[in-house]
Amino acid sequence: MTLFESARAVANAGGDGAIDWDAVSEAAKAATDPGDLDLSEAEAEAYAADVRDARAQLRDVSGLEFDVPETVEIQNRHHWVDANVATFRRVFEPLNERASYLPGVARSLNTATTAGALAFVSRHVLGQYDPLLLADTSDHALYFVHPNVVGAADSLDVAFPRFRRWIAFHEVTHAAEFGAAPWLADHLEDQLEAGVAALADGEVRREAFRELHVAMTAVEGYAELLMDEAFDGEYADLRAKLDARRRGGSPLTNLVKRALGLQLKREQYERGRAFFETVAAERGLAGASRVWDDPEYLPTDAELDAPRAWLARVTDSAGETAE
């Protein structure tokens, strides 16, 4: 697979939609080395054991009832691309339904941009909890991109089993959140559908995307808090190294991250973590977990920077007396 093959896949993009998803998959994979996925049975079982342990310890610490996907998918980069092309295809279906008027050059540009984004992320993503938004199933999925986990552990000078376990705990925290808040997937789907439908009509509904960003900031921030409570070992060095990894990279890499909006992901981690650290300091983990009781308890954009205002609102809504 070569960049030439990737370019050829984009050039041959066809169909009637805004994006040729088959060409996206082909081009993204042509531009990306799949990585080594030669695991022994014991190595594969170690991932599953970490997930089981994470579920047990997260339930004990948080009191949240949730399940993890029955199948833990240990992927190479191409597998991850395929899984996410399927998600993107579902999310952007309204664009394809209303884009038959697009000239071929626009379709090729959309295809190339999406393929480039997926190729780039596939080389960096470590794990992913996938709630399978907008899918015709109530199932969910858990992915570990093994070549990237191995590479990151090596570059950060961290023992692979310990790093693998850290990633497993982080992704299982997301399963805990979606399990604790059955409404969360529907809420995210509503915002996605509203935003994409507006784009299909030639509009930009900023409010939908803003609410989506705020919700994901809460998701990432609570996950960071829960990780700190549940992980079974020293983690300060892992946290510091991963924070540096999120902020680091060459100037070109950082430019690409900014262009793809990946800097927003780092902002979600940092802003969400600061919010929940303040909440937990005042009301403990149980107080922070109130965020999943009702969609109305999600913080607003302003409250993310004023967590005590959120605490006051949630306390008043529940008819409680503030401490």
Locate each region found by the language model:
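Auxiliary, metal-adjacent structural segments of Zn-dependent hydrolase domains
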Residues: A48-N148
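Acidic/histidine-rich catalytic neighborhood
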Residues: D186-A223
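Pan-zinc metallopeptidase signature
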Residues: Y222-E323
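Catalytic Zn2+-binding segment of zinc metalloproteases
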Residues: E171-L188
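Short pre-active-site segment immediately N-terminal to the catalytic Zn-binding motif
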Residues: V150-I167
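Active-site rim elements
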Residues: D38-E41, R206-V214, A259-K265
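N-terminal low-structure segments adjacent to metalloprotease catalytic domains
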Residues: M1-D82, P161, G287-E323
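Short alpha-helical functional segments enriched in proximate histidine and acidic residues
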Residues: Q57, A175, G179, L226
